[in-house]
């Protein structure tokens, strides 16, 4: 399968070849992509029609509607190809299928998907009448044109009036089609990212192979002897992939009343900048490899989260770049939890959006935009044996602007798209333009049309921008 960069590059060059009228070059680019998406198959079909090869166009449109069974404009153009091949019964069937995919709407605007064309219901009915004329169904053709006139914009009936007059005189009607030279084009947002990007950067040493190294935070695995302390305070497993982020979990730290254990997995590991001297300890987080607090010692949390020896401490598990189990007072406020989390993960604590795991077997993550949501989370956690579980999410360090709910299902047309089902909640990471958003859903990141979603509720604090009011109730 071609990479996203190769796909977008071939797509863009093919569209430029269409603009120049170089049909052979355009077909080579559109058809040369392995397993092309539906929009590229549609482009190839349109170019075959322009080149005067309706048979090849029919095969290309067959692939397009097979890959995307809801592509109304694909059935529309396939009907045109069948019409040019004098297969009028097949053309009539395709035009009816195109009208069915309009789902009662007056038009479908394909501009936001890259095609500068709006498929109108009256145009489809006009082509239905054209095929019926070729089949000798004059009464049905006149009825189809009258229905098309009812869907035509007010005050602009002259074109269909002349067509109806021609049908009543039993004259043929040429079919309408997508304007010459119009094809699906890649979004300009993708064209800006065709150049390679170094996501990993330079490697950093996070674990020393020297046993006597005094660097803090990460140490090589220590030998275990018969007299070694079985309550070892540190265990680090070296990994050649240290310093890169490959998964949602890479280390877990548990701070209890009588022990402190830290484990770094081979998948992922936080980076350590300081080497050569001991760093001052943050309150509430014991040094890795050092002695933990005794049975009567309570780690002090920032902002009062761990203060107050008279109140019992509970474990709060937080998932960020890695999982951290912190000790905090039950019912601690939002600022106290963020301050306590900031001692271990300053960057995520500032940019990430906190969510809590709802109770139940099919529990989902519920955002915590304000203090009231956190207190509700504490109430739910009181009846849950696993305690309060939080998630500090920001999709690779990127903050979540706000959340939207899918009003309609959206099928990804290519690897750059984010598909989802009706009712799914999507985290919005970027407002690409007036018609497109970039979002995160079920561990995947991609772009999707704004008209498929509606706001999920109040915006998260500090999130810029607004979902346009005109898009909130649209349907595709």
Curated annotation (Swiss-Prot):
Single GO cellular component term: NADPH oxidase complex
Alphabetized UniProt keyword annotations: Cell membrane, Cytoplasm, Membrane, Phosphoprotein, Repeat, SH3 domain, TPR repeat
Result after altering residue 172 to A: Loss of phosphorylation. Loss of interaction with YHAWZ
Residues with Phosphoserine modification: 172, 461
Residue ranges of every copy of the PB1 domain listed in the record: 315-395
Protein name: NADPH oxidase activator 1
InterPro entries: NCF2_NOXA1, PB1-like, PB1_dom, SH3-like_dom_sf, SH3_domain, TPR-like_helical_dom_sf, TPR_rpt
Molecular-function annotations in GO: enzyme binding; identical protein binding; SH3 domain binding; small GTPase binding; superoxide-generating NADPH oxidase activator activity
Spans annotated as Disordered: 259-308
Region (Mediates interaction with RAC1): 1-224
Record annotation: effect of changing residue 103 to E: Loss of function and loss of interaction with RAC1. Loss of localization to membranes
Subunit structure: NOX1, NOXA1, NOXO1, RAC1 and CYBA forms a functional multimeric complex supporting ROS production. Interaction with YWHAZ prevents the interaction of NOXA1 with NOXO1 and RAC1 and its targeting to membranes, hence reducing its ability to activate NOX1. Interacts (via N-terminus) with SH3PXD2A and SH3PXD2B; the interaction is direct. Interacts with NCF1. Interacts with RAC1. Interacts with NOXO1. Interacts with NOX1.
Signal peptide: none
Purpose of the protein: Functions as an activator of NOX1, a superoxide-producing NADPH oxidase. Functions in the production of reactive oxygen species (ROS) which participate in a variety of biological processes including host defense, hormone biosynthesis, oxygen sensing and signal transduction. May also activate CYBB/gp91phox and NOX3.
Resulting phenotype, residue 436 to R: Loss of interaction with NOXO1 and NCF1. Loss of localization to membranes. Partial loss of function
Domain observations: The SH3 domain mediates interaction with NOXO1 and NCF1 and has autoregulatory function. The TPR repeats mediate interaction with RAC1.
Subcellular location as annotated: Cytoplasm; Cell membrane
The TPR repeat ranges on this chain: 7-38, 39-71, 73-105, 122-155
Mod. after translation: Interaction with YWHAZ depends on phosphorylation by PKA.
Domain of life: Eukaryota
Organism: Homo sapiens (Human)
Compositionally biased residues, Polar residues: 260-271
